[in-house]
């Protein structure tokens, strides 16, 4: 189990996939022994064997029910305390088979691009394999004679899903069953990076040949207003993860990439950063000063821009000179130049720039 004495903010938790596998394993034990256990040891995808508390265990001659309450540790996860529930029933005519199904609160896949069957449950590949492995580990004797259907459900999962990107990805009616290791690390960016990649993959299946990458909610709202002809799934909030978004676009064969952002993140992209988090690299104000000088800004303004720490300051000084649009256009052009160097002949590129109120300032080309 997790270390309850870990320093605040560092306690790990378990994924929805791990909890589903534990519930399924407990239910199968119930079918084998006639009693669902109060605790179960479950093998996680990373190879760890972990003990879970089991709730609401029930069993009859042909089915069993078990539930595991998710503990996300110190991660602020909307699925923390979710009831991952497994209902397992015998399939007399399908000896040796384990059939995975989605119940209430588990989303249904409605769009291609996720590596999951359209119309099927949103249970990702690693959790699928892990659930089946745990079922087979304790149900081998049963599977010699019958098959087993394992239905995973999550009460209140549809409400939880409203706090996720599932609807944007075409996953409707509930949450996804996720987890590549079985462990949730507090404030980990892995889940968000994965959602960015999935979003780009879905955009690649829409037939428009374009993905619109934005740095956040305000920039996305701005770009959506600029490009109303595109459906919502064509827009992906990449946050700080340009590298992963662009890599996914290459793999998806997308030929046009539109980037929407504000001066700070765009400056980092222009200077060659592909992870634009504030803690990763400082803004290259020298680059901004050079752009300003190229537009005829006085030397004292260029020196002030170079000596300041923020890109916003540069924009404000250029606005005061009446050169705001030209400055932001030059920055957008530099972003395109940098990305063309990094991804030669891969994409048609466009950059849209907005201010801190979400109003359009400039675009390129």
UniProtKB/Swiss-Prot annotation:
Q: Where is the signal peptide?
A: none
Q: Which cysteines are joined by disulfide bonds?
A: none
Q: Name one GO molecular function term.
A: cobalt-precorrin-5B C1-methyltransferase activity
Q: Which GO terms describe its biological process?
A: anaerobic cobalamin biosynthetic process; methylation
* Enzyme Commission numbers on file: 2.1.1.195
Q: In which pathway does it act?
A: Cofactor biosynthesis; adenosylcobalamin biosynthesis; cob(II)yrinate a,c-diamide from sirohydrochlorin (anaerobic route): step 6/10
Q: Which UniProt keywords apply?
A: Cobalamin biosynthesis, Methyltransferase, S-adenosyl-L-methionine, Transferase
**Does Zinc count among this protein's keywords?**
no
A Pfam match: CbiD
Q: What SUPFAM superfamilies does this protein map onto? A: CbiD-like
**InterPro entries hit by this protein:** CbiD, CbiD_sf
Reaction(s) the record says it catalyses: Co-precorrin-5B + S-adenosyl-L-methionine = Co-precorrin-6A + S-adenosyl-L-homocysteine
Has UniProt tagged this entry with the keyword Membrane?
A: no
Q: What family is it from?
A: Belongs to the CbiD family.
Its name, as the record gives it, is Cobalt-precorrin-5B C(1)-methyltransferase
Q: Which gene encodes it?
A: cbiD
């Amino acid at each position: 189990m997790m270390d309850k004495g870990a320093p605040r903010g560092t306690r790990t938790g378990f994924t929805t996939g791990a909890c589903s596998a534990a519930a399924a394993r407990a239910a199968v034990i119930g079918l084998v022994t006639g009693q669902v256990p109060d605790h179960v040891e479950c093998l996680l995808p990373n190879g760890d064997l972990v003990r879970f508390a089991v709730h609401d265990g029930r069993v009859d001659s042909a089915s069993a029910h078990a539930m595991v309450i998710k503990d996300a540790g110190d991660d602020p996860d909307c699925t923390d305390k979710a009831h991952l529930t497994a209902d397992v029933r015998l399939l007399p005519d399908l000896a040796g088979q384990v059939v995975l199904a989605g119940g209430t609160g588990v989303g249904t896949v409605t769009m291609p691009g996720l590596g999951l069957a359209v119309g099927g449950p949103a249970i990702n590949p690693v959790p699928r394999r892990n659930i089946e492995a745990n079922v087979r580990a304790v149900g081998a004797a049963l599977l010699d004679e019958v098959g087993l259907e394992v239905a995973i459900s999550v009460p209140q999962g549809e409400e939880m899903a409203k706090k996720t990107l599932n609807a944007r990805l075409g996953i409707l009616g509930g949450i996804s069953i996720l987890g590549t290791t079985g462990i949730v690390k507090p404030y980990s960016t892995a889940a968000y990076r994965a959602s960015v990649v999935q979003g780009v993959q879905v955009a690649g299946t829409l037939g428009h040949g374009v993905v619109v990458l934005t740095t956040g909610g305000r920039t996305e709202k701005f770009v959506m207003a600029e490009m109303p002809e595109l459906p919502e799934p064509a827009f992906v909030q990449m946050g700080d993860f340009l590298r992963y978004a662009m890599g996914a676009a290459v793999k998806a064969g997308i030929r046009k990439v539109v980037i929407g952002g504000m001066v700070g993140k765009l400056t980092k992209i222009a200077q060659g950063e592909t992870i634009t988090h504030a803690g990763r690299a400082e803004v290259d104000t020298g680059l901004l000063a050079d752009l300003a000088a190229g537009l005829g800004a006085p030397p004292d303004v260029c020196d002030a821009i170079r000596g300041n720490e923020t890109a916003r300051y540069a924009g404000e000084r250029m606005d005061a000179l009446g050169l705001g649009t030209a400055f932001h256009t030059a920055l957008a052009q530099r972003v395109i130049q940098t990305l063309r160097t990094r991804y030669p002949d891969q994409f048609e590129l466009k950059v849209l720039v907005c201010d801190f109120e979400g109003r359009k300032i400039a675009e390129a080309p």
